[in-house]
Amino acid sequence: MKLLFRLLKYAKPYTILFIIAIAIVLSLTFVTLLPPQIVRTAINQYITNENLPLNERFNGIFKMAIYFLLSTSAIFVLEYFSIFLTTYIGGKIVYDIRNDLFKHVLRLPMSFFDKHPSGQITTRIANDTQNVMEFFTSVITSIINDVFLLAGVIFMMLKVSTSLFVNISFVFPILIAAILIFRYFDLKAYRAVRTNISRVNAYLAEHIAGMPIVKLFNAEDFERKGFDKVNKNLYKSRIQQMYVFAIFRPTVSTLYRLAIAAIVWMGAKYIASKSLNFGDLYAFVAYLDLFMRPLEDLSEKYDIIQNTTASAEKIFTLMDESEEHYGDEKGETEIKEGVVEFKNVWFRYTEDRWILKDINVKFQPGELVAIVGETGAGKTSIMNLINGMYRPQKGGILIDNLELEKYNIHELRKQISAVPQDVVLFSGTLLDNVRLFHDEINEEEVKKALEKVYVWDMIERLPEKLYTKIIERGKGISAGERQLIALARSVLFDAKIFILDEATSNIDVQTEERIQNAVRELSRDKTVIMIAHRLATVVNADRIVVVHNGEIVEEGTHKELMQKKGVYYKLYEIQFAK
């Protein structure tokens, strides 16, 4: 219940609209009770009353028909406004929740994303919030409507004939029990279907994304069997759900018809004894139909409340994740020179293994420094620490002799440009992807940045040039072209510190040489750190830092390190061995 109350806090800005919606629902409840009463009056006073002249009977029936038409029209209008208003309120609340949730996700540390798959986070923001919407659109006002309608129906039944109500009251527990049993098994089957749908979706998402590997290794038959397995489980759960529906729905309907038969049989006895009129019997049967609706509705709403509670738990679990609190919001906002220094830095992603051990290194402006080492040595982790994506467990990182914690981390990142190994492009235009949706940057500035990394000639040949559409993560654009666009981003934002993580690994030799020249130009007044696996790209670096098993084991120029014949020498020999 705490979760539901927490959800209701989001309804507070819409309190007046909720009050109006509840007033409409209560009016709807009252008007819904009128049609059986109108027909009852028509039957008792005009249709079966032979004491009235024929023209008076016709006039009375016509008058009742007008009342019936007005009441059904009122029901239509009230239902329209009720549905419209609750859907509007629910949509606004879910809009607010989604916005809050996504804003919170943007402020989460990278360590959170290392532990949680992106599909799970997407489900929380997109699907679970949609489940919550149903709570606001159909549960709150519907429960009020159902409770008052049940009370109203029972009151009207007692008003029509207390004796008949008492005599047939045994059918109510039977109907209620049948509906509850049906709902229990239906919910169980429904949840099994939902679970299997999620598994099918997850299988498709993972294996369609990996389709190049599937085709490359001729794994189509294996994939077909794998999908058939999860698809068959979904099919079986669907059949189980249909079986439950096929058994229980007719059972409930049959019990309802038997209840009507019992009312008609007992009502006939009352009519024969002159203690009940035909109109009273009709009204009683009509009110039984109205009695069934809120019963089924309430049991259905219970299912929705359970689903909402489960979704709310997932939403608030994500919302309660600790935000990134690295740095000082009121701290330093400007990198003046760009001197980066690691002092006795120890870092790990998980408790069981240190990635970096006692790192001591300094990067100066005007100097091109390359970091090399085997795969998994800890090179990329150094970049992540400079960006403030992670916090070291021991030691400190200083920029311009000021600890990273004393900077405003968001302002700091604006002044550090990084080209990662895995370049992400967003849906939109090439222009948007280079300037990263900073509309204040004009096309001419973007063009100059692209020229500096020698990619403008390629873009100029495209039919729509900078307005070429990029689809889903840059599909259709080669890995090399993506890296060039990422380089252009870094050049455009003119940062003090410039980090390239394997940034030329997918580029041809000629373009790579041009990029090296561009990087050399950048290093004249900036701190440039180049993380590289291919040693041919770093031979002209001012200084090379060699990382081995998380430790810095060597430093120097290419020539100096080759003369030492240490780790760097061995790596070089392996790469260039004939």
Residues covered by each model-derived region:
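ABC-type nucleotide-binding domain
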Residues: 54, 327, 333-578
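Hydrophobic alpha-helical segments in the permease module
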Residues: 68-75, 79, 172-179, 245-259, ...
